[in-house]
Amino acid sequence: MNSISANLNIMIKASEKASKALIRDFGEIEKLQVSKKGPTDFVSNADIKAEKIIIEELKKAKPNYSILSEENGYDEQKDKKNTWVIDPIDGTINFLHGIPHFAISIALKSSDEIISGLIFDPIKNEMFYAEKNNGAFLNNHRIKVSKKNQINDCLFATGGKTNNESDLPYRKSGCAALDMAYVACGRYDGYFQHDLNLWDVAAGIILVKEAGGLLEEIDMAQTKKLKIVASTPDINSKLKEKLANF
């Protein structure tokens, strides 16, 4: 593995430990007890279990870091500057329906900046990770955004209800974290979506940036109702024109 920080190593170990429980639960999906959390957002025992494992591992290593997570919200600790941002299962609905497209997402926010992040797809065993000024990687191999420069040749990812993307070639996968990871490694050429939570995209933000992509400025003090437009540099302005009313 290329040289990584102690904090990123902690994140990798936490995600790998949580993934073992997720894979077991995914194999017995019909036995999961699910409680309704919102009209299109369901929380499962697997989600809660994975988050607990991740938080325990992170706290063991850095007990004073604050935590922002999907299930527990913001847990302020002595160190308010550094915050772990956790989504134990991004793509929960896919997971609950037996669709093997979901991921663990963990990022570290220092003040108002994401400085490291990982997105782990336990089914495909793909670990995407990045650190500030150190590049983006997939399973120890450096990754870059695509070099497409014609918007008609591109494939984009989006999610939720959108009204302005009809003339863009796009896919809706149900997993924002993997959508952004796929932009970072060139599988998608861009990603756009409304109404995101910070834990959905925190790791993806640094992955795209470190892979050479462009994103609109994001207020890191805001944790909900985020809008993301991310893409390869050569089509960024054209994509923004297409999404002028997005």
What are the roles of these predicted feature ranges?
Residues 15-18, 136, 204, 211-213:
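Small-residue (primarily alanine) positions within well-ordered alpha-helices
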